[in-house]
């Protein structure tokens, strides 16, 4: 399976590493270029932007967003705008569940699937 990861802090980096060990292909992006270099050195692919991350992936895409809750909604929207019907965007942060219900309703007409899997 191929998975995109937006946000390569402690949790996103750890998830990419575990997924790579399990045999999955990962593409990662973080606004901190050093975080991207770190996962590339661990065997993942890196991207310099969210657009590049999506462009490296094969449909149907699954993009996991692991950013602080304050930024999750805007990043999920940015990712979803680049996806196609049938793709999946995952909010893995600790966003308020009500915000995620609203995001799911907002994205439903686009055909992009939204999954809330709070991990912290």
Q: PLM ranges: what are they?
A:
Residues 85-88, 92-120:
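Rossmann-fold NAD(P)-binding glycine/threonine-rich loop
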Residues 63-79, 96-99:
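Beta-loop-alpha module in the N-terminal Rossmann-like domain of NAD(P)-dependent dehydrogenases
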Residues 31, 50, 67, 92-93, ...:
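Fold-independent oxyanion-binding glycine-rich loops
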């Amino acid at each position: 399976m191929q998975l995109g990861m937006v946000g390569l802090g402690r949790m996103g980096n750890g998830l990419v590493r575990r997924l790579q060990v399990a045999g999955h292909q990962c593409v990662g992006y973080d606004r901190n270029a050093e975080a991207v270099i770190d996962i590339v050195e661990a065997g993942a692919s890196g991207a310099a932007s969210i657009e590049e991350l999506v462009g490296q992936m094969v449909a149907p895409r699954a993009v996991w967003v692991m950013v602080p809750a304050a930024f999750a909604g805007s990043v999920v929207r940015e990712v979803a705008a680049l996806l196609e019907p049938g793709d999946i965007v995952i909010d893995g942060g600790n966003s308020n569940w009500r915000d995620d219900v609203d995001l799911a309703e907002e994205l439903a007409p686009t055909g992009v699937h939204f999954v809330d899997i709070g991990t912290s």
